[in-house]
Each structure stands twice: as structure tokens, then as C-alpha cells.
Regions:
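N-terminal secretory signal peptides and thylakoid transit peptides that target proteins
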Residues: 1-16
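Extracytoplasmic/periplasmic ligand-capture domains
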Residues: 4, 28-29, 64, 90-119, ...
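C-terminal segment of N-terminal export signals and the immediately downstream linker at the start
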Residues: 23-41, 269-272
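Short, well-ordered beta-strand elements
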Residues: 33-42, 84-87, 135, 174-176, ...
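N-terminal lobe/hinge region of extracytoplasmic solute-binding protein
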Residues: 37-80, 111, 171
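A structural "hinge/loop" feature
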Residues: 39-53, 72-73, 99, 146-154, ...
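Residue-level recognition of beta-strand termini and adjacent short loop/turns
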Residues: 80, 131-133, 183
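Surface-exposed binding/hinge segments that line
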Residues: 88, 119-160
Length: 285
């Protein structure tokens, strides 16, 4: 499979919330447990992006090693022109309300994105159900990159296609289900007991995201142990005040985390900001 170029990710807009992949020991394996407490700024929409990433899935995803793999899709293929694609859907999936994932939910979600002029679905002519568990995509022009486009974190699949639900009412198929939330202020979610990603992702038992506008106050909250991870532009307020992991680096940081929070090891020469799925791929030491 082709690796997804980091610059392409940034150009797609997905990098705005990409939050995973830096070095830990190969021997350090993920384990379940704990609540991730994350402080984010009010500006930039990070609360919503991380929350949506926890609650929703896409058809495909970019794995930590940079390869494309299925998420709600288990496979895909196109004709020679790359104008017609067949995407086969996973069958062992249910929404947080207990209802099974249906092809109609996928079609309604993608049509909702397309109706809003989403450029990632530019050139999409039709979506139709095929054989009960697959969807046919018909494009205006051939596009061999369609499976990568479907991995974009904005193209979430929601129950009944309600892709613009408020934080409190989001109903997805992701690892975490909403417990309570208020747009622009806070978000709490709990790990689903059974999920098709069990054993490979979703290591926290619960998530607590809180908006703190002032960067100095976010740093103080991290320093004093009130949160585990804070979105920070610089390490000011942390230097000499404890031991922290700076992500992607101290000189060019987006996040700071306590030493008890483990980030996936860096693979090859990929950059650190390669995936938004902090809630899936980080864990507590």
C-alpha cells in the first residue's frame, strides 16, 4: 500500500487536530485503564475535533505506520477507470444507541457532507447500495485516491446521517460514547464495553476534555496535576517545574503531557503530527 505523505495530510486540513506518534520503548505495550484529562483552548475548535474523533469513525483510516486501512470499511476496489468504486462495510458494528450500522447511515452521512460542498467529496455523482453490505461510488472523473479521501477525519459516519449533531447528541460507532458535553466548554465520554477495535485501540476508560482559554492557566493545570495533557504553544510555565513530554518537540510543540501518559512510538521518519486520534492511541503508563 502507498504511504500517505505528511504534507498531503496537512494540505487536506486533517492535520489541524493530528495528535499522535512519538517515541516510546518497543517493550512498552498499551494497557487499558485511567481517564485522560485534556485541557484545550477555546479558539481553533480542538475540543470539537478531538471529541468527534473519539465518538465517530470514518470508512477508512491512516494507521500509525502511515498505511491506509479499513475502519468501517473492510475492503474496496475500483474499475480500471477509477470512476466506480465498491466499498464493503464492516458487519460487526453498532451505534452508541444500540442500532446496527446500516449502509443507509453511511450513504446519508456522505450525502450530508457532499451537500455542504465538502471538497473531499468533490466529483461524487452517486452513492448506491450494492449486495446489502456494500456501497458503490460513482465519480464524475476517475480518482485513484478516493480511499485516502475517505480517511479524512471530517468525513465521519453518523446515525441517520446526522453529521452536524451537537457534542451532547453525537451518535457514532467510535470507541467512546458521550456521557455529557456542552459545546465550547467541556466533553466527557466513556469507553464502550465491546468494540471491533478491542485490543488494538481505545486504552482509556474515560475521557475528560475541558476548555481553558488562557495558555498560562492550562500550563498550571498540567503542572499541578489537574489535567494529564494540555494544548500549549510553548513550554513556558513548565520548564523547571516538573518532567513533561513535549509533542512533537519542545521547540515546536502543540501538546505537553505528564510522564504517566504514553504516546505511540515514532515509526520510520514520519513526522509527529500524523493522526488526530489521541483518544485511541495514547495510554496511561
Amino acid at each position: 500500500m502507498k504511504r500517505l505523505d505528511r504534507r498531503a495530510l496537512f494540505a487536506s486540513g486533517a492535520a489541524a487536530a493530528l495528535l499522535a506518534a512519538t517515541g516510546t520503548s518497543l517493550a512498552q505495550q498499551p494497557r487499558r485503564g485511567g481517564t485522560l484529562r485534556l485541557a484545550v483552548p477555546r479558539d481553533g475548535g480542538l475540543l470539537e475535533r478531538v471529541a468527534r474523533g473519539a465518538v465517530y469513525d470514518q470508512l477508512t483510516e491512516v494507521a500509525p505506520d502511515g498505511l491506509l486501512r479499513g475502519e468501517l470499511a473492510t475492503g474496496w476496489h475500483s474499475d480500471d477507470s477509477a470512476r466506480r468504486w465498491i466499498v464493503k462495510l464492516r458487519q460487526d458494528v453498532s451505534f452508541h444507541n444500540g442500532l446496527p450500522l446500516r449502509a443507509s447511515d453511511v450513504i446519508a452521512s456522505l450525502e450530508a457532507h457532499a451537500s455542504r460542498g465538502d471538497l473531499r467529496l468533490e466529483g461524487l455523482r452517486a452513492l448506491t447500495l450494492k449486495d446489502g453490505d456494500a456501497i458503490e461510488f460513482v465519480l464524475d472523473e476517475g480518482n485513484p485516491h478516493l480511499p485516502y479521501r475517505l480517511a479524512d477525519t471530517g468525513l465521519v459516519i453518523a446515525a441517520d446521517g446526522d453529521v452536524q449533531a451537537s457534542l451532547a447528541t453525537m451518535t457514532g460507532t467510535g470507541l467512546y460514547a458521550v456521557e455529557r458535553a456542552q459545546d465550547g466548554r467541556h466533553f466527557r465520554a466513556r469507553r464502550r464495553e465491546q468494540h471491533y477495535k478491542d485490543g488494538s485501540a481505545g486504552w482509556f476508560d474515560a475521557l475528560d476534555l475541558i476548555v481553558i482559554s488562557d495558555a498560562a492557566v492550562r500550563a498550571e493545570a498540567l503542572r499541578d496535576g489537574f489535567v494529564d495533557v494540555a494544548s500549549l504553544p510553548t513550554p513556558e510555565g513548565l520548564r523547571g517545574r516538573g518532567s513533561f513530554n513535549y509533542h512533537p518537540s519542545e521547540g515546536d510543540m502543540a501538546l505537553a503531557a505528564g510522564q504517566h501518559v504514553v504516546m505511540p512510538r515514532r515509526i520510520s521518519n514520519r513526522g509527529s503530527l500524523d493522526d488526530h486520534r489521541i483518544t485511541e492511541r495514547w495510554w496511561m503508563a
